[in-house]
C-alpha cells in the first residue's frame, strides 16, 4: 500500500496532524494514552490508576480510538486498550525522552 507522506503543502495531512495533536493536547487524554504504552490495559485499571471514573475514561478512549491513537481488544467481558501501533508509541516515547533532556543553556 502506497501512502502519501505528510508535507507542509498538503492541507489534508496538516489538518489530520492538527486533529491528532489537539486530541493529545488534553492532559487527561494524554495520561490515558500514556497508561496504554506498556501494553493492553482494561478501562477500570486506567480509571483507577488515574483516579477518574470509568465512564470518563471510556469517553476519552472512544475519541482516541476513532483517531487511531489507541486500539481495543475484547477479552471476555473486558476490553483492553493499547497504543494503536509503533508510530504512536514511538512519538510518545520520543517526546518523553525529549522533555527529560537537559536544556543545555537553551532558554525555555
Please describe what each predicted stretch is.
Residues 58-59, 97:
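Intrinsically disordered, low-complexity cationic segments
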Residues 1-16, 85-108:
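Amphipathic alpha-helical dimerization/coiled-coil segments
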Residues 33, 66-67:
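Extended rod-forming repeat segments used as scaffolds/tethers
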Residues 63-64, 82, 102:
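Alpha-helical and His/Cys-centered functional microenvironments
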Residues 48, 59, 65-66:
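Alpha-helical residues within the helix-turn-helix
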Residues 12-55, 75, 79-87:
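N-terminal helix-turn-helix DNA-binding core of bacterial DNA-binding proteins
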Residues 40-41, 65, 96:
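Residue-level detector of secondary-structure transition/capping positions
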Amino acid at each position: 500500500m502506497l501512502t502519501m507522506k505528510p508535507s507542509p503543502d498538503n492541507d489534508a495531512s496538516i489538518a489530520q496532524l492538527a486533529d491528532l495533536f489537539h486530541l493529545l493536547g488534553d492532559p487527561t487524554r494524554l495520561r490515558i494514552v500514556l497508561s496504554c504504552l506498556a501494553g493492553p490495559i482494561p478501562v477500570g485499571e486506567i480509571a483507577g490508576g488515574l483516579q477518574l471514573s470509568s465512564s470518563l475514561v471510556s469517553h476519552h478512549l472512544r475519541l482516541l480510538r476513532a483517531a487511531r491513537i489507541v486500539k481495543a481488544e475484547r477479552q471476555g467481558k473486558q476490553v483492553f486498550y493499547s497504543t494503536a501501533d509503533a508510530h504512536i508509541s514511538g512519538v510518545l516515547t520520543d517526546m518523553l525522552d525529549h522533555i527529560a533532556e537537559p536544556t543545555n543553556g537553551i532558554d525555555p
